[in-house]
């Protein structure tokens, strides 16, 4: 159970917002969800937890390729950012006021796996066709060359596409029904490709240049659009494709989205790509980060030193910041502490709340501070951009 530490007039971490204009009202709505081939009853919840989130259709429908992202990406950091970042980017095309969210219903597990595979040629293709008469040679990753050593083959033809994610956005058709209004497709691309020459051998790495990754991502995106347009339900809806650069397995921060494109309803033409200038940065800063973001580096250093001075029983302060166009937009700080009693947790949290407001009072930055011990989460401090006062919770 949580005990709320009131600072000014704080409420819950996620405040219940008013209902949106597209799906307004203070009552649950029972509506009909229509597709090209069927219709079924659905419920629109009466509350939305935040303007930053979409309402979701009930009953909840799991994605047709559910779980594949977890299996295909390198770290939990990338898994989370790939999904939540795709929803964040969707808001540029599909307003949270006018659209409902639904996990992908048009790309099933078998389809996605076949697309993530390598293209087969020569004897590999003949073998696959012999083993499965219904085999479809749909791999979006390059085939391995027919000659050369295993190392030479993998170095020259790495796997570029690591994972694919579909999100569907539903829009009101009329007073009593909704229909598919748009689709987001995320393509997760490898910045580092890992392979083994033989089972049990040490893992080898192939670093992929940013320019190559972008070129291959755009090429794959065009083929994905061509294939999606052949599906009845996806012929005449806008589709946005976003390219995600997956971090290496050893990275302590997630990767980032690098570009996106919007394809108009009924079209297969990708006319242009919009660059996405965002990245995650770890604090305390290394030399490169300190040189690029000297002011932010100094703020974090002073924040950390202040904690060291007044509370020695902690084991470190680390932060992960999201930068958009080289400006900090979010800062998540994790502080593990040695637990000596609840009164110390309260005192530490009170002190930290003041420090957060002193050092991170810029209205454009979302700040979250998590205080933990060996027993788990002890407290959380949240100050969203524009808030005059933070929200604080101490856990019982």
Swiss-Prot record:
Basic and acidic residues bias locations: 126-136
Chain residues carrying a lipid of type S-diacylglycerol cysteine: 19
One GO location term (cellular component): plasma membrane
Highest taxon of the lineage: Bacteria
Main location class: membrane
Signal peptide segment: 1-18
Subcellular location: Cell membrane; Membrane raft
Membrane topology term: Lipid-anchor
CDD domains, per the entry: CamS_repeat_1, CamS_repeat_2
InterPro entries the UniProt entry points to: CamS
Region (Disordered): 126-155
Keywords for this protein: Cell membrane, Lipoprotein, Membrane, Palmitate, Signal
Annotated lipid attachment (N-palmitoyl cysteine): 19
Protein name: Uncharacterized lipoprotein YerH
Biological classification of the source: Bacteria, Bacillati, Bacillota, Bacilli, Bacillales
């Amino acid at each position: 159970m949580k005990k709320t530490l009131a600072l000014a007039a704080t409420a819950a971490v996620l405040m219940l917002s008013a209902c949106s204009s597209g799906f307004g009202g203070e009552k649950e709505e029972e509506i009909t969800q229509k597709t090209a081939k069927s219709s079924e009853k659905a419920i629109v919840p009466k509350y939305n937890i935040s303007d930053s989130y979409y309402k979701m259709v009930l009953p909840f429908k799991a994605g047709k390729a559910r779980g594949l992202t977890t299996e295909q990406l390198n770290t939990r950091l990338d898994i989370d950012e790939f999904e939540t970042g795709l929803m964040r980017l969707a808001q540029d095309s599909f307003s949270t006021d006018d659209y409902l969210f639904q996990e992908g219903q048009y790309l099933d597990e078998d389809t996605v796996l076949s697309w993530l595979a390598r293209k087969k040629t020569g004897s590999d293709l003949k073998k696959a066709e012999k083993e499965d008469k219904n085999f479809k040679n749909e791999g979006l990753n390059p085939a391995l060359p027919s000659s050369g050593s295993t190392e030479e083959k993998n170095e020259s033809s790495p796997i570029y596409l690591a994972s694919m994610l579909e999100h569907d956005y539903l829009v009101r058709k009329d007073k009593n029904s909704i229909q598919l209004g748009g689709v987001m497709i995320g393509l997760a691309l490898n910045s580092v490709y890992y392979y083994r020459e033989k089972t049990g051998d040490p893992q080898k790495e192939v670093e992929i240049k940013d320019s190559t990754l972008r070129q291959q991502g755009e090429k794959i995106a065009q083929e994905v659009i061509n294939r999606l347009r052949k599906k009845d339900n996806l012929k005449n809806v806008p589709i946005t494709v976003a390219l995600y650069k997956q971090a290496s397995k050893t990275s302590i921060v997630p990767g980032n989205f690098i570009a996106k494109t919007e394809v108009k309803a009924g079209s297969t033409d990708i006319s242009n790509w919009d660059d996405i200038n965002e990245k995650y940065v770890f604090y305390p800063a290394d030399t490169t980060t300190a040189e690029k973001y000297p002011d932010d580096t100094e703020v974090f250093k002073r924040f950390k030193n202040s904690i060291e001075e007044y509370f020695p029983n902690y084991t470190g302060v680390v932060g992960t910041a999201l930068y958009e166009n080289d400006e900090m937009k979010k800062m998540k700080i994790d502080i593990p502490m040695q637990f000596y009693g609840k009164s110390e947790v309260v005192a530490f949290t009170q002190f930290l709340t003041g420090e957060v407001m002193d050092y991170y009072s810029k209205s454009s930055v979302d700040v979250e501070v998590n205080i933990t011990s060996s027993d788990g989460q002890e407290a959380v401090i949240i100050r969203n951009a524009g808030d005059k006062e933070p929200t604080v919770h101490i856990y019982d």
